[in-house]
A protein has these predicted regions:
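Surface-exposed binding/hinge segments that line
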Residues: 364, 370, 374-379, 399-443
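N-terminal lobe/hinge region of extracytoplasmic solute-binding protein
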Residues: 310-363, 447-448
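Long beta-strand-rich cores associated with HINT superfamily self-processing modules
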Residues: 763-789
Length: 789
């Protein structure tokens, strides 16, 4: 079978048929070979000259058939140079026809016109073939033949009439097979090209097809497309309106009024979310319906609710969560960190003291904190705060923090609004340790700046309700609902329909498609400010996973570049998304402030499954010798269970990794986890796929690899490097310490670094005030408002 769009030349040739090109080629019945054609005079002649392939695959030629008296043979000749490619009809006795037989291209032959029974011109043969194809409903190849003639032989007699027949018959066939959009396109092409051809029949067919098409969209509840179809018909046929247009306009108006009635009923029952949904459907169908916009505006004013599509939820909100995205997201909404990370700077992160102002001493031994409005509702005073600092530095307390205890020396209180922290040694960023949530001063009052509290769960919906002591502003959400989805496609469809206003943490390939979609005017895809780092962390001990060379083999066996670009990014590129060689982000460019910890001299291990097999052999031999010395027998490589968090990017990447490990004879299975267990818990899997927000490497290194951390390690080299990093007294030492740690991680592989990914979210245009490039979805939730129609 020939592939029509195989090259640019064919693409150019297809243009004369316009919109029907793709339609007919990809919706017509399967192609049929020419051998199946009935034995017409043309087919007999072609069989005689041994031409059984498609004429379009041949160089142009003509056929001369001699009379019975002159042998009756048919001869394949080069195209004859007739004026305008018309066979002369006024030849005289004795005149001869000069031809070039293709078997002897250098010779010219003369044939008496009296001996010529028939001449088949190349374009006439193609036309005859096309006629046969139309009769036998082989519309794909018929199109090819007709299109070839239109480009190369537009004056061929009978071409225009056959094209008309082709369009009407193919449209009828498409209609019979219920391919309504394609049938409509072909009929409109016919009407446009031949406005007087069977005018009444074509118009009746257009009316029938358009009515069925709108009905089909209506039955699928695709009202937007049905409405758009009617609007186009109204515009395109304004001079001679189709009766179907008026009929559907009346039906849409009736439907819009039904939605309005339901919206009012739901409003009376205080079901504001349902009422708003019905009101939005009403306006989608009839934007100018009387009182429609006022109704939606009133609903948004009375009780605005924002709905967020999420793919993970957490029962433990935490503003300082390093490797738990849903915990960090919900923590932003219902908690307030003591110190809030606001972005990257020339020397580490930029922080804001949520309760007032702070000042670090020049020698970096002290941190002065000034509390504003101490004692007000929800605002702790200096004594309460000092007790919190001391508890977190005391062994045995539930919220004990080893890293904080290692640097805190003392806390001094100077009245209710001021206190001073003194450290055992200078530290460049002590405030980075203080991102834990502000403790509540009472059960009734939350910290200042916290607007919402958990209302409860209803199935897959988690409700957060307004809890601030001050009333919400006009059109500010009184509730935020996080709706849990397993299928990203379902979430996107609901988002495009307006059933949810936001999608958090889009699958990167979906984000790319949404940016380029036709709906880009009504939705915004926004990047988060900083990337997440993805890695594999061994959690269960066995002889193989404990061996460094075996872990290196696992890393060599992963085609990280292909998985990242092909599977996760959907074949695209993204500045923030790239393969990494260590535990820290490298940023979008080398000068990115967040890249201060990344050691660019450590190269990424290239994909090399053969080397991976060699390393496995080396590791196995070493382990076998060690086992034999103990009198034991080395067990075979066990099936490795890879636990991935339950969201699309991790599931896709995890499955690809499992398949690539199989290529080096390492069996594996994918385990989807709703929650990544901590190192303190018994691990249900051998390896976990970890996503970490390592945005302040100077302190996050300890939070990643330290005791109780998600990638906890007892590797003595890593532990020593963490200790040296913690003792760094200036930014030169911090950078060097981080980069040394990067090198050690690449050498010892307590984790298998994969890639960093630029995360994103999407929101609809009716919701405004969302921060550009935020660190988290709810970073400036206090600014969210609904745009009224």
């Amino acid at each position: 079978m020939r592939i029509p769009f195989a090259n640019k030349a064919w693409d150019r040739a297809c243009r004369p048929f316009g919109a029907v090109v793709a339609i007919l080629l990809f919706t017509s019945v399967p192609f049929t070979s020419v051998q199946s054609f009935a034995q017409t005079p043309l087919e007999k002649v072609l069989e005689e000259i041994e031409t059984t392939s498609s004429l379009l695959d041949e160089e142009p030629f003509d056929i001369v058939t001699l009379t019975a008296e002159a042998s009756g043979r048919s001869v394949k000749v080069a195209p004859i140079d007739f004026p305008n490619r018309r066979i002369p009809t006024d030849t005289k006795d004795g005149e001869k026809l000069q031809v070039t037989i293709l078997l002897f291209p250098t010779r010219r032959y003369e044939v008496a016109w009296n001996d010529v029974a028939r001449i088949w011109l190349y374009e006439q043969m193609i036309l005859e073939r096309a006629k046969t194809m139309v009769r036998e409903k082989i519309f794909g190849e018929a199109f090819e033949h007709l299109n070839y003639l239109m480009v190369n032989y537009p004056q061929t007699p009978g071409l225009a009439s056959l094209r008309q027949e082709f369009l009407i018959e193919s449209a009828a066939d498409l209609l019979q097979r219920k391919s309504l959009p394609h049938a409509m396109a072909v009929l409109e092409e016919l009407q446009k090209s031949f406005p007087n051809y069977q005018r009444d029949r074509v118009r009746n067919l257009i009316t029938t097809v358009s009515n069925q098409l709108v009905q089909a969209y209506f039955d699928k509840n695709d009202l937007a497309t049905a409405k758009a179809m009617v609007a186009r018909l109204d515009k395109d046929y304004s001079a001679d309106p189709l009766p179907v247009v008026g009929q559907w306009k009346e039906k849409f108006l009736e439907l819009a009024e039904e939605y309005r009635a339901r919206a009012l009923q739901l409003r009376d029952r205080k079901d504001y979310l349902g009422a708003r949904r019905e009101a939005k459907r009403m306006l989608e169908i009839e934007p100018e319906i009387d009182g429609g916009k006022d109704l939606l505006r009133d609903l948004l004013r009375e009780y605005p609710i924002a709905r967020v599509a999420v793919f993970q939820q957490s029962n433990h909100p935490d503003t300082a969560a390093l490797a738990d995205w849903p915990a960090f997201r919900s923590g932003q909404l219902i908690e307030k960190p003591l110190f809030e990370f606001r972005g990257t700077g020339a020397e580490g992160g930029q922080y804001r003291f949520s309760l007032g102002s702070f000042q670090q001493s020049d020698d970096q031994f002290e941190l002065d904190l000034a509390i504003q409005n101490a004692g007000n509702v929800g605002v702790p005073n200096s004594l309460m705060l000092s007790q919190s600092f001391l508890r977190r530095a005391t062994i045995g307390k539930p919220d004990y923090s080893p890293a904080w205890a290692a640097i805190l020396d003392s806390v001094s209180v100077f009245g209710p609004e001021r206190l001073k922290l003194r450290f055992r040694r200078p530290h460049v960023l002590p405030q980075a340790f203080l991102q834990w949530p502000i403790e509540r001063t009472s059960a009734e009052s939350g910290p200042p700046g916290v607007l919402y509290r958990v209302q409860g769960d209803e199935g897959t919906v988690r409700r957060f309700a307004w809890s601030a002591s001050t009333p919400a502003a006009e059109f500010q959400p009184l509730e935020i609902h996080e709706v849990l989805y397993q299928d990203p496609n379902e979430a996107i469809n609901q988002f495009l329909r307006g059933d949810v206003e936001i999608i958090d943490r889009l699958f990167p390939a979906d984000a790319r498609r949404l940016r380029g979609a036709s709906v880009a005017r009504t939705v915004t895809v926004e990047n988060y400010a900083l990337p997440t780092v993805h890695m594999l962390v061994p959690r269960r001990s066995n002889p193989y996973l404990d061996d460094r060379e075996f872990r290196r083999a696992l890393l060599y066996a992963i085609n990280r570049e292909a998985i990242l670009k092909g599977e996760i990014l959907g074949g695209g590129e993204a500045a923030q998304s790239q393969v990494i060689s260590g535990p820290f982000p490298r940023g979008a460019v080398d000068t990115d402030p967040i890249a201060y910890a990344y050691n660019t001299s450590v190269e990424n291990l290239a994909y090399d499954p053969r080397l991976a097999k060699v390393l496995i052999l080396i590791a196995s031999n070493k382990l076998r010798v060690a086992a034999e010395k103990k009198g034991d027998k080395l067990p075979p490589i066990p099936k490795l269970s890879l636990g991935v968090p339950n969201y699309e990017a991790a599931r896709v990447a995890g499955q690809a990794i499992i398949e690539q490990w199989k290529l080096i004879d390492v069996p594996g299975e994918l385990v989807v986890l709703d929650r990544i267990p901590s190192p303190k818990e018994e691990s249900p899997v051998d390896i976990v796929y970890l996503t970490a927000s390592v945005w302040e490497p100077a302190t996050d290194a300890e939070r990643l690899f330290g005791v109780g951390a998600p990638a906890q390690t007892n590797n003595q080299f890593i532990v020593q490097a963490l200790s040296q990093l913690g003792a760094a007294r200036n930014w030169i030492q911090v950078r060097q310490g981080c980069q040394d740690l990067h090198s050690l991680v690449a050498a010892h592989l307590p984790i298998l670094p994969l890639w960093q990914v630029g995360e994103s979210f999407a929101y609809r245009s009716e919701l405004i005030g969302i921060a550009p490039k935020p660190l988290g979805l709810y970073q400036d939730v206090q600014k969210w408002r609904y745009r009224v129609p």
